[in-house]
Amino acid sequence: MFKCYNRPMLQLHKKNLFLFLMLFFALESFTEENPYVFIDNNAQKMVQVLTLEAALFETDRSLYEQKIKDIFEPMIDFRRVAASVMGKKYYLLASQGERSEFVLIFKDSLLDTYAETLAQWGDSTITTKFPDSKSNIYEKNVEVKQVLNTGSSKYPISYKLRRNEEGWKIVNIIINGVNLGLTFRNQFQALAVTHDENIDLTLQNWVSDAGDAGIS
């Protein structure tokens, strides 16, 4: 038996549906546009890998680290970070091909370093510090702070984010006071000097190394 709704009732249903869809898309947009939610969501995904996939660390470490890379890779603006690591002097000295090559080299080495470091933290928790005001989520550059709790110690993490056409992307990370961007830039400059500012040789010998950032 079919029910026949009168016009006012249909209009009410349409209005409620419209409001629901507006709220849904507003929440989706807020999640995409809010850098704190962006960082926190991905951090919790990493925590799940660290805890739920702990056994995989012993049986297949490469796969374990790849799961971390899959989360972390889309979060970073590698082109901007790589250019910053090269510094203005060496970026201008490098050819377009060498610049593009370093983006790939730096990306692989950074992901390997980050995944290997995270893998050693094991059963940890990460807490994001949300601001009282949401006003700065509409800015182009934002700093998001977190606290890593390894069980025995707590360490501060600070993400520097910049909004581009793809959304929010990480452009620098400071872990326990160690500025990774600055550390890598100093390494690049030292390596370039060692190789008489030969960019090709510098790229061939590049290895991202930030130690354990004071976390153990």
What are the residue ranges of the model-derived segments?
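Bacterial N-terminal signal peptides that target proteins for export
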Residues: 6-17
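Early exported N-terminus immediately downstream of N-terminal targeting peptides
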Residues: 33-114
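Low-complexity, intrinsically disordered terminal/linker segments enriched in charged
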Residues: 172-216
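Short beta-strand edge/turn micro-motifs at domain boundaries
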Residues: 154-182
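Surface-exposed, charged secondary-structure patches
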Residues: 112-155, 205-216
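N-terminal signal peptide c-region/cleavage motif recognized by signal peptidases
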Residues: 26-28
